[in-house]
Amino acid sequence: IPSDEGSFFCEETEVDVTRSPLQTLRDLFREHPFLSYPYAAVRIITSEPNYTIVPEAIYEDEAKERLYRFTFATPVEIVVAQPLRELESVLLFGLRRDMHDFIAQTLPTAHWEHTLASLLLGWHERSLRALHAHMYAVVQDRTMDVACFDRGTLQFVNRFEVENHDDMMYYLLYVWKQLELDQRNDALTLSAVASVAFDLKEQLQTYLQDIRVEAIQTLYRADDRAATVGRLTVTPTTNT
């Protein structure tokens, strides 16, 4: 565990995908006692696929249940609302009740966040200084998150299930067309495993001019990578 300000400790653990997510989490806490230490701040960062963004203006108490039913195609047990004040929006994502309750009992000060939140805030900050629209695509496993900003305004965000390059090409070009982006002046940044990103860039260059590749490791803002004394960040991942 880091004891010096600015130090960073990271541990990756392989898990048995045949076991339930809750049992896997219990095993991790039993095998790694530092997870249960008292911390000044605890962040649980999830990449839960069930998410959406709603404007702050319509996220009111009397409308929440209706929003949840409309947002999630299948019922979710717990809905977490993460404010994104810079975007004047709220990021909603669903969680399993058993995992949520286990974390609440084990780490009562834990704060849930979605991996997409940090990305959106970083892209929003960039777009405030940009003259043209910019689309971002992040490919991990069999999903692709796509977002587009135009001078500080979020134009689009969604997650797609993808199996191959053809799927990625289809969704990227479809969204590009629907948003009426300019193939000469507007930009696309791809983040994926290097071989995927550069192969996809080569194919897309037939249609778009400004295509960039950014390593996934550099996506997250500095405050997501920097560890401070008394802080714990846990990032569960889902294998598909």
Label the model's feature ranges.
Residues 1-240:
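Hydrophobic/aromatic-enriched cytosolic interaction surfaces used to assemble or bind macromolecules
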